[in-house]
């Protein structure tokens, strides 16, 4: 048995709301938005200019190198590298070939850990199939983990199919769940919460099993959950959702996706840090202005240390948490 295939123990999970209970104005509005988005995406994608615009966006994709200063308690994580992919929106102009090329580029960076920040698909569950070939390109030693975003939950249905597909393809789902990872002799707690707008996030469940003082990384699709994270001694929160505004005019986004201005980049609250990625894909229109797509590459850095790769130390792995059972 490979050391990258861990034994997992229950820590907490999201209990999805039955489809039959999701009635009323909110459900109808969600479906209207989903259908409208899908229709506009497909119509534009059929036009040559739609594909041309999307190709321009993908050529602008950048890997953003980031360094996270480590607190003394986290010094053992020095040199750990994390690739964070958010808002792929598979099916929204993003086809299987695009995704495979993007994932191959991620693999070439040799991250120790790959994290997905939600909105892997756009409006339909069958868009998951577009991810298959790309996911086969990735095999980070500490594994791959994901949380759902609002687009993954647009239909208000059980996320069992979404979860089981990802698990089948090597991605563990952290939906109000946490796992313990070991790297270079040090441990840290990796956890994720449900989407803030379409789901039922519960950080208490996600942190169940965390040891006192243990370094903690949180995945939350929506950045506005950062206040909860900062109040719970979370060292690093990784979020997406905003697309960096997707369209910015004079440095400002006409459409706001965060009530607190968490549009892109670093934010700090006490000892807790948040990074909001601009994401990889687009939705509705294949246009990005002053908000190029990005894949952050986060390197943990202890003060006074050189960031040198330690290949032999990247293979340790143990987890606690259970996210591989489809609901």
What role is predicted for each listed range?
Residues 61, 70-83, 172, 178-191, ...:
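Beta-strand-turn-beta hairpins that frame and shape the catalytic cleft
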Residues 83-86, 113-119, 143-150, 174-177, ...:
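Active-site neighborhood of phospho(di)ester-bond hydrolases with catalytic His/Asp-centered motifs
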Residues 30-134:
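N-terminal active-site segment of His-dependent metallophosphoesterases
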Residues 94-182:
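Core catalytic region of metal-dependent phosphoesterases/phosphodiesterases
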């Amino acid at each position: 048995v490979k050391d990258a295939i861990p034994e997992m123990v229950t820590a907490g999970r999201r209990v999805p709301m039955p489809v039959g209970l999701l009635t009323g104005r909110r459900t109808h509005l969600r479906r209207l938005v989903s259908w409208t988005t899908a229709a506009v995406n497909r119509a534009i994608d059929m036009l040559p200019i739609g594909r041309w615009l999307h190709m321009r966006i993908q050529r602008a994709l950048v890997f953003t190198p980031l360094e996270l200063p480590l607190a003394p308690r986290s010094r053992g994580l020095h040199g750990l590298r994390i690739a964070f992919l958010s808002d792929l929106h598979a099916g929204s102009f993003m086809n299987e070939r695009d995704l495979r090329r993007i994932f191959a580029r991620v693999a070439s960076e040799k991250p120790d850990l790959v994290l997905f920040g939600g909105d892997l698909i756009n409006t339909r569950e069958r868009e998951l199939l577009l991810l298959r070939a790309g996911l086969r390109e990735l095999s980070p030693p500490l594994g791959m983990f994901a949380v759902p975003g609002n687009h993954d939950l647009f239909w208000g249905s059980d996320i069992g199919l979404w979860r089981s597909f990802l698990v089948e393809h090597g991605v563990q789902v952290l939906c109000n769940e946490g796992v313990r990872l070991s790297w270079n002799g040090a441990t840290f707690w990796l956890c994720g919460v449900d989407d803030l707008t379409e789901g039922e996030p519960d950080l208490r469940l996600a942190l169940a099993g965390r040891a006192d003082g243990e370094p903690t990384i949180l995945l939350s699709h929506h950045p506005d959950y950062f206040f909860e994270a900062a109040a719970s001694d979370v060292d690093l929160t990784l979020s997406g959702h905003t697309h960096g505004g997707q369209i910015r005019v004079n440095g400002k986004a006409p459409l706001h996706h965060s009530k607190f201005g968490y549009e892109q980049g670093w934010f700090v609250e006490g000892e807790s840090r948040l990074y909001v990625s601009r994401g990889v894909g687009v939705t509705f229109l294949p246009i990005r202005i002053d908000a190029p797509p990005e894949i952050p590459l986060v390197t943990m850095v202890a003060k006074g240390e050189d960031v040198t790769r330690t290949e032999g130390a990247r293979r340790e792995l143990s987890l606690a948490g259970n996210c591989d059972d489809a609901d």
